[in-house]
Regions:
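N-terminal positively charged helical leader segments and presequences
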Residues: 1-94
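RNA substrate-binding interface of SAM-dependent RNA methyltransferases
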Residues: 15, 19, 26, 33, ...
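Structured adenosyl-cofactor binding patch, chiefly the S-adenosyl-L-methionine
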Residues: 18, 29, 144-149, 213, ...
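Short, glycine/polar-rich helix-capping loops at beta-to-alpha or helix-loop-helix junctions
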Residues: 40, 137-144, 209-218
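General small-molecule cofactor/ligand-binding pocket signal
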Residues: 54-59, 159, 178, 223
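Short beta->alpha connector loops at strand-helix junctions that form conserved
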Residues: 59, 107, 133-134, 162, ...
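Short, hinge-like loop/turn segments at secondary-structure boundaries
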Residues: 73-76, 147-151, 195-198
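Active-site/ligand-binding-proximal alpha/beta "capping" segment
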Residues: 177-238
Length: 256
């Protein structure tokens, strides 16, 4: 939940706030917690006091719900300045190419929880770059995505772009562009072989419609996740949730 008056974003959830404390406590502008959580944030309160930043043990957890707009606060809410999503530029992508870094590109992922889960998986598998389009259908960083990321937001860079096709065109021959599709002929098991000793851009599509036809046409490879009995059997469910699928794909990409 955003506080537009103060340009703040509420970060809630124990793991998210604890990781924020360990990695970037200076970003916290205000802290609120329940009596049950108070013993776990004594050290942070001392730091905030030294920095002359307010903190408060609330009398009623309803106040935490009001601050973050959710009942899923887990007894703590930290306010931070609303994160600025940095625009992706050629200097950054040139570094990706040089260092053979990989990135996750989201094609209109509309659910904030899915964005958070994807960021969590990216952090777990050591992928530091997530790219989102400036599109009304694309979820941005919210209180919900922060909570679901379970601290992953502190370890992943999120960039914005105006045009997915333009980025994919710019990366042609420089990075391997791998999209996901239910009608793909290749599977995620071959991703390591597709890398060609280059960085990889994994494109994940919208929850309902997948990646667009134009984006598919700009991919070097299209892959799907093989199910039990592949290719002879058909699964009871056609596909995984996009966040679940992202974890499988990242495992195949980063696994030894």
């Amino acid at each position: 939940m955003k506080n537009t008056l103060n340009n703040e974003l509420a970060v809630c959830g124990f793991a998210a706030v604890k990781t924020l404390e360990k990695a970037n406590w200076e970003r916290i502008t205000r802290l609120y917690f329940s009596s049950a959580r108070a013993p776990l944030f004594g050290g942070l309160c001392k730091k905030l006091a030294a920095a002359k930043k307010p903190y408060n043990q609330v009398k009623d957890e309803v106040e935490l719900e009001r601050l973050c707009g959710s009942v899923h606060h887990q007894g703590v809410v930290a306010m931070i300045q609303t994160p600025e999503i940095k625009a992706l530029n050629t200097e950054i992508t040139a570094k990706w190419v040089e260092e053979k870094q990989s990135a996750i590109l989201l094609d209109r992922i509309g659910n904030a929880n899915n964005l958070g889960a994807i960021v969590r998986s990216a952090a777990f598998f050591g992928i530091k770059n997530v790219v989102i389009p400036l599109d009304e259908a694309q979820s941005s960083v919210t209180t919900s995505s922060y909570r679901v990321a379970e601290g992953g937001m502190e370890f992943v860079n999120i960039y914005s772009i105006k045009s997915i096709p333009r980025l994919l065109n710019d990366m042609a021959g420089k990075m391997v562009r791998i999209g996901t599709s239910l009608d793909a002929k290749e599977t995620t098991r071959s991703i390591k072989q597709m890398c060609q000793d280059k960085g990889v851009i994994i494109i994940l599509g919208n929850e309902e419609n997948g990646i667009s036809k134009e984006v598919k046409s700009l991919c070097d490879h299209l892959v799907l996740i093989p199910y039990a009995g592949f290719p002879d059997a058909k699964p009871v469910i056609d596909s995984l949730n996009v966040a679940q699928a992202s974890s499988v794909i990242m495992y195949e990409l980063m696994g030894k």
